[in-house]
Amino acid sequence: MKILYTNFHSGPDIGGHTTYVSRLAAGLSKRYRIAIAAPAGSALHGLADAMPNVSAHAQDFPSRVTRLPAAVRTLRTLLKREGFDIVHVNGSADHRLVSLASLFLKRKPRVVFTKHNNIPISSFSARIRARVTHHVIAVCKHVENEVKRSPYGACSVSTVFNGVDTAHFSPYDPADAARHREALLGPAAHGRILLGSNAGTASYKSWLDLVRAVALLPPEVADRFHIAMAGEKFSRSQQTELEALGMTARVTHVGSLRDVRDFVSAIDVGFVLSTRVETISFACREMMAMGKPVIVSDYAGLPENITPGVDGWVVPPAGPQALAALLHKLAAGEFDLPAMGRAARAKSQKSFGLGPFLESTAYVYRSTLPPQALGHELHGLM
């Protein structure tokens, strides 16, 4: 089986789409012939270029109509030359371009589309793309329900939960974790509960709700907490609010990280508090795999990760007051954080692993193809 993965994101940071595609490509490259088409200079193109048994192709997915013809020609040439069995698209821009590039091809690939986010599906444009889509993958049950209510409901739909490498994302030795914590915070590391997130700093992540919650606490309780963030530089408005709340000294920003494990090892409690866009969150699952209980907002598929009070907590979206109440309990020692971390790790090993993620996705591919196309599979290599 020959598979082409496409992704339109052009930035250098590793986001959820990049993580998703790169893990599938690396995991399935011993079984199938894998190629990735992504913009030159993007994080995904760079990762693909370094992967063994994966071919990387520089491909733009422009939104401007004037740039579409050249991009369509480039992609059509690739599709015609390589004869892919499956093209797995991951967003509206690459989905649209694949649809256009496949027109009039004698041998058209089967198109699999993963719905990663919770952005509403436009009925008109989705109706057009659904006609050339053979299977839709939802990354959580919430998204599956949304997809089935959309024009894509006419397609075959499966839920395949995002998987993480639980051997790669695993708890650190306590001494190593303490060393990374000291390097991150210095003297502020001692006697404080470190709340951290590798989910990013975009506005829809609503991480400022946690800052607002700490600001609501009495000074002696607030002093028990420090917040650490990994991700892009704070926006001007975010920085302005930090300063207005007097919280600048209580927040540490480490920037964008290629490898988040040292950072995650240093924290006590993770959080993903999104109020838009988010679905299941790789970051949440990575933190849980590393033995960290996680606070999530009751939004989209985020609660599907958590057993409340066992391996994390679910709070109302955009609810600093509810967060502040939870922080009071954390400061008072009402939760056994190490035990909750062990429960998070155990759940990740049982439910979040790469194996089911890869096998379920491969099953979608096989079910989408006619029997004769399965001869492209490389037997015995996985």
Predicted segments with their positions:
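Carbohydrate-associated surface elements
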Residues: 142, 163
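A conserved, positively charged/aromatic
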Residues: 106-141, 152
